[in-house]
Design a protein with these regions (language model features):
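Long, well-ordered core segments of solenoidal/helical folds
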Residues: 182-191, 245-261, 296-319, 352-373, ...
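Extracellular fibronectin type III
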Residues: 113-130
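Recognizes extended acidic, P/S/T-rich segments that occur
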Residues: 68-101
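Well-ordered alpha-helical scaffold segments within catalytic/enzyme domains
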Residues: 151-170, 224-240, 251-260, 273-293, ...
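Pro/Thr/Ser/Gly-rich low-complexity, intrinsically disordered linker/stalk tracts
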Residues: 27-62
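Extended polysaccharide-engagement surfaces of secreted carbohydrate-active enzymes
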Residues: 381-546
Length: 546
C-alpha cells in the first residue's frame, strides 16, 4: 500500500505535536546505581519492612523538580487497584495512611520544571507484614492542622498549660523555685554578650580561630539557656518581669550578626543552637512581643535557617536526603523542624523546613543504626546524637501527635549501651572514643519513661537498671520538669539476669558476647565487628576486628 501525503497542514501539525508529546512523556529515567554515600533505592526489591507505610526513596535525577509515585498489589499497575501520589517534592515518599498488609509493588517517575515526565522506573516488590508498626506521615495540610494555631507549640500545647501550672503550684513547686532562682540570677547579671572573636575549626593551621571555636559554642549555649529559662518561667507564672526579661533576651539574640562570630558556615557548632533554641524561647513567650519585635526576630531566624538550608549539611533538603551519612548534618534537621513549628504562618519557608524534617525522620533517620538499636559510630556518638533526638521525639509528640518511638530502633535504643558498655566496663566496644568507659546519659530517662506509654515497656526496666548502676545524673531544669509532667513514672530498675547474655546488632555488623551482663568485673566479654558501614564517619575500627 502506498502512503498518501497529508494535504491538511493543521492535521499534520496535530500529529507532529502528538508524536512529540509521546516521545517527551517517555523520555528515559536515570536509574543509576546508588553510590556508597547515597541512601539509594529503598525498600530494596523483595524487602520486608518494619514500618507501615514504608518510605519509598530513590536517586534524584539532576533536572527533577517533582515526582509521581505508584504502588499496587499487581506488578502491572492497573488503573483499578493502583494508588498514585502526584507532585511529590522530595526524592522520598511516605503515605499518610497505612498500606494493606501483603505484597506491594512500587515505582516512581520524575518531572522537570516544565512538568514533562520520564518513563516509570522499574517496579520493586515490598512485603508489608501485618505486624509492622503503623506510622503514617501527615501531609503538609495535616501538619498545619495538627500544630496548634496559638502558642506554646514546642514541648507543650496551649491546652497543657492549666495542668502544668497546677503542678508547679503543688508537687513540682521545688522545680519552679529552682527555675525562678535561675531566672532571677540571669535578670541580675544581664544577657551573655555576643562572642567577640571569630572561631572556626575549618583551618587547622589557624590557632587563633581554633582557640575560639568551641568556647563560642559554649557562650551561645549559655545565652540561649538564659532566654529559654526566662521564657519558660514566664509561661508557668505569667509574671510580667520574666516576660520582659525573655523579650529583652530574644531581641538581644536577634541583634547578633548572622554573618559574624556565630555564622553557621564559619562555625556550625556556634551556629546550630541559634537555629532552634531562640525558637523555643520565642514560642514560650510569644505574647510579650509587639508585631514589630516579632518581625525582627523572624528576620534573623529566617536568615540563620536559610544559611543552614543552603549549606552542604542540608543542601536544600534534597541533598541531605540523598546523602544522609554526614555526621554533623544529622544534628541539623530536627533543629529546622523546631524553627518550622515555632514560626509556622510567620516565615514563608517554615512549612518547607518542617516538611523536610519529617521526610528526613521517616525515610532516613537514624542512618548509623539498625532495627536492633545498634549505632555504627559507637556508644559515645550514640549518646551524643540521641541526647538531641530525645528533644525532637518530644516535640513530634506534642506538636504533631507523631509517636516516633514506633520506629524499631527507638523501641530498642537502650540495648546497645547495655550490651557494649555494661556496668564497670573499662571501655565501650567499637567506634570513636570507645577506649574509655561510657557515662550514663541523662536523656535515657526519657526512653525509660516513654516506653511505658508506647508499647509494652520493652526492655525499659533493664535500661533503668543500667542507668542506675552507671550513676545516671538526674534531669533538672526545664527538661526534668517536662519529663515528670508529661511522661509516666520510670520503670523500676531490673537486673538483666533473665536477658540473653549476648546480642547481635546485625545492621551494624557487631556481635557482643558475654558470660554476664551484671558486672564487667566478673564477665568475659568478646566483641566482633564486620560492619556494612565499613569505617565511615566515627566508626573508625577496622573491619573484621574483635
Amino acid at each position: 500500500m502506498r502512503l498518501q501525503p497529508l494535504r491538511d497542514p493543521r492535521l499534520a501539525l496535530s500529529l507532529m505535536l502528538s508524536l512529540i508529546a509521546v516521545v517527551a512523556a517517555e523520555r528515559p529515567l536515570d536509574e543509576r546505581a546508588a553510590r556508597p554515600d547515597e541512601w539509594g533505592y529503598r525498600p530494596a526489591d523483595g524487602a520486608r519492612v518494619a514500618l507501615n507505610p514504608p518510605s519509598f526513596t530513590w536517586i534524584a535525577p539532576a533536572d527533577a523538580v517533582a515526582y509521581d509515585v505508584e504502588w499496587s498489589a499487581d506488578p502491572a499497575f492497573p488503573a483499578v487497584g493502583t494508588t498514585t501520589a502526584a507532585s511529590v517534592v522530595w526524592p522520598t515518599y511516605t503515605h499518610d495512611a497505612p498500606l494493606a498488609a501483603g505484597t506491594h509493588h512500587w515505582r516512581y517517575r520524575a518531572r522537570d520544571a516544565r512538568g514533562d515526565a520520564t518513563a516509570w522506573s522499574r517496579a520493586r516488590r515490598v512485603e508489608v507484614p501485618a505486624a509492622a508498626a503503623i506510622l503514617p506521615l501527615p501531609g503538609r495540610a495535616e501538619q498545619r492542622a495538627r500544630v496548634p494555631a496559638g502558642h506554646p507549640r514546642l514541648f507543650l500545647r496551649p491546652e497543657d498549660l492549666p495542668r502544668l501550672r497546677e503542678l508547679v503550684r503543688g508537687p513540682e513547686a521545688p522545680a519552679l523555685a529552682e527555675l525562678r532562682a535561675a531566672a532571677e540570677r540571669y535578670l541580675a547579671a544581664g544577657p551573655t554578650p555576643e562572642p567577640p572573636h571569630k572561631g572556626s575549626a575549618r583551618d587547622k593551621t589557624n590557632a587563633e580561630l581554633i582557640k575560639y571555636w568551641w568556647p563560642n559554642r559554649v557562650q551561645v549555649e549559655q545565652a540561649c539557656t538564659e532566654a529559654e529559662t526566662l521564657a519558660f518561667v514566664y509561661l508557668l507564672t505569667g509574671e510580667r518581669r520574666f516576660g520582659e526579661g525573655a523579650r529583652r533576651w530574644l531581641l538581644h539574640l536577634a541583634a547578633w550578626d548572622p554573618q559574624g562570630t556565630t555564622n553557621f558556615t564559619l562555625n556550625c557548632e556556634a551556629g546550630k543552637p541559634l537555629l532552634h533554641r531562640p525558637a523555643r524561647a520565642y514560642d514560650w513567650a510569644w505574647d510579650v512581643f509587639t508585631a514589630e519585635e516579632r518581625g525582627r526576630i523572624q528576620a534573623t531566624m529566617r536568615t540563620r535557617v536559610l544559611e543552614a538550608w543552603n549549606s552542604g549539611e542540608v543542601a536544600r533538603g534534597v541533598g541531605h536526603l540523598q546523602r544522609p551519612y554526614g555526621s554533623h548534618a544529622n544534628r541539623v534537621w530536627h533543629k529546622l523542624a523546631e524553627a518550622g513549628i515555632a514560626f509556622l504562618d510567620e516565615i514563608p519557608e517554615a512549612p518547607q523546613w518542617l516538611d523536610y524534617a519529617l521526610n528526613k525522620f521517616y525515610s532516613c533517620y537514624p542512618v548509623w543504626s539498625d532495627d536492633d538499636g545498634g549505632w555504627h559510630e559507637g556508644v559515645s556518638y550514640w549518646s551524643s546524637y540521641q541526647s538531641k533526638a530525645a528533644g525532637w521525639l518530644q516535640v513530634a509528640q506534642t506538636a504533631l501527635r507523631i509517636d516516633g518511638l514506633r520506629k524499631p530502633f527507638f523501641a530498642q535504643v537502650g540495648d546497645y549501651p547495655l550490651y557494649l558498655a555494661p556496668p564497670h566496663s573499662p571501655n565501650s566496644g567499637f567506634g570513636d572514643l570507645s577506649f574509655r568507659p561510657l557515662d550514663a546519659p541523662a536523656f535515657l530517662e526519657y526512653h525509660v519513661r516513654a516506653r511505658a506509654a508506647s508499647g509494652d515497656g520493652g526492655n525499659a526496666a533493664y535500661w533503668a537498671w543500667w542507668a542506675r548502676e552507671k550513676r545516671q545524673p538526674a534531669n533538672g531544669g526545664i527538661i526534668g520538669l517536662l519529663y515528670r509532667a508529661n511522661l509516666p513514672a520510670p520503670a523500676a530498675p531490673r537486673p538483666p539476669a533473665d536477658l540473653p547474655a549476648s546480642k547481635v546488632f546485625r545492621g551494624i555488623g557487631v556481635a557482643s558476647l558475654h558470660t554476664t551482663l551484671l558486672d564487667s568485673r566478673e564477665d568475659v566479654h568478646f566483641a566482633f565487628k564486620a560492619s556494612p558501614f565499613g569505617s565511615q564517619s566515627h566508626g573508625h575500627n577496622p573491619q573484621n576486628s574483635f
